[in-house]
Design a protein with these regions (language model features):
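Glycoside hydrolase catalytic-domain context in secreted enzymes
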Residues: 1-406
């Protein structure tokens, strides 16, 4: 994987001021790194998300505002059920084409945290409770994305397996447990896929924040596994910028806070932070720019083809848990369908993984298309009560009130 920037990193390092160095190791806002115009160093664009591009429109919003149209591929939880890494390779290639079209250089994904607890609110973004399956799927997706010149950010490094107290939680585990399960997925990815970046997590590990954990970021990641990419923070994970740099953290996201920049400049001035420690991070930022920067691809995206790919993979990943003779359907069958999700389906989560789908096919659309093709007639009636989020399970409306197919 090689970008189009072709910078002389060693020459640039000699010309950068301390202030410019401090700026380069932090984002200028939620989605861009800081450029240095006088030296021709461009800004990189980063964007969510793990199973489809979420190129946000407008101001920072914590994953709520409108985003550019993109393809909503099946989530990691779904694709892992297909046990087919090639599906992920095709997804990665397609997402990367959309990234290039929208001028995105680094995709913030895939998410590979191990599913320790089924109640974790972001489990749908992750592949599996098994480090081998998770890494095999992720490796294929990463290779697909990076084959198109777009970088990835594998997240969340590490032991980030719960959303409770997400900014300060403490994951307590023995080194044996970490290496056998929670770090193994990252180790296989780093060694086999050479991801452009890793995103360190909010949580602490045995009392030490990931963004300040030298054992995690340097001893294991770089010295043992040979990682040569960049480490960025999850958004707002920095507690102490100088300690983070000394531990092996390169890029602070999302913003270029005056406090953190001052910590770096003051640290260099008073000797708390060595210039060599800062330059390691600066070099990694410059290498990432050199590796992933390319001009926006004006070629139109074939969203119809990507939507068809998503549908094909979704079908391949579907798992039939039980069948009491209802399937396969026969042309003569009369179908009784009830529930709000027949027309307003839930196909993704919220936040940083929420995609504005360029194409959307609901179950209703699919049944209408199939019904027309098979000559079936349709009768419509009142929708269900819509309380799909209620804790109470309500009875399905009688047939006369539901959508029916004959």
């Amino acid at each position: 994987m090689k970008g189009m920037c072709l910078m002389d990193v060693n020459m640039l390092l000699k010309q950068l001021t301390v202030e410019e160095r401090a700026a380069l190791v932090a984002g200028t806002d939620f989605w861009y790194t800081n450029p240095v115009p006088r030296l021709g160093i461009p800004a990189l664009s980063v964007s969510d998300g793990p199973h489809g591009l979420r190129k946000q429109l407008g101001e920072a919003d914590n994953g709520i505002a409108t985003s550019e149209p993109a393809t909503a591929f099946p989530t990691a939880a779904a694709t892992a059920s297909g046990w087919n890494p090639e599906n992920l390779r095709h997804i990665g290639e397609a997402i990367a084409r959309e990234c290039r079209h929208y001028g995105v250089h680094v995709l913030l994904g895939p998410g590979v945290n191990i599913k320790r607890n089924p109640l974790c609110g972001r489990n749908f973004e992750y592949f599996s409770e098994d480090p081998y399956l998770s890494s095999e799927m992720a490796i294929a997706e990463i290779e697909g994305v990076q084959s198109q010149g777009v970088g990835v950010s594998v997240k969340h490094y590490a032991l980030n397996n719960s959303e409770n107290f997400r900014f300060m939680g403490n994951s307590v585990a023995s080194e044996k447990t970490m290496r056998a399960i929670y770090l193994k997925v990252f180790e296989r990815i780093v060694k086999q896929a050479r991801p452009a970046t890793l995103m360190c997590a909010y949580n602490r590990i045995n009392g030490v924040y990931c963004a300040e954990n030298k054992w995690l970021l340097t001893d294991v990641l770089r010295k043992e596994w040979g990682f040569d990419g960049l480490v960025m923070t999850d958004w707002g994970a920095v507690k102490n910028r100088v300690t983070g740099l000394q531990a092996g953290l390169d890029l602070e996201m999302p913003g270029d806070t005056a406090i953190c920049r001052k910590q770096i400049i003051d640290g260099i001035a008073d000797g708390t932070l060595a210039m060599e420690e800062l330059d390691k991070a600066v070099r990694n930022v410059l290498n990432l720019i050199d590796r992933t920067y390319q001009e926006t691809d004006s070629t139109p995206v074939d969203f119809d083809a990507h939507h068809a790919l998503a549908a094909e993979i979704a079908a391949d990943c579907a798992v039939l848990m039980k069948n009491d003779g209802a399937l396969p359907l026969k042309p003569s069958d009369r179908l009784h369908i009830c529930g709000e999700m027949f027309e307003h389906m839930r196909y993704q989560g919220a936040g940083s993984s929420m995609i504005n789908p360029a194409r959307l096919t609901t179950p209703k659309d699919a049944f209408e298309a199939r019904g027309t093709a098979n000559g079936r007639s349709r009768r419509t009636c009142a929708p269900s009560n819509g309380r799909t989020s209620s804790r109470r399970i309500r009875r399905c409306p009688p047939p006369i009130q539901a959508s029916c197919w004959a």
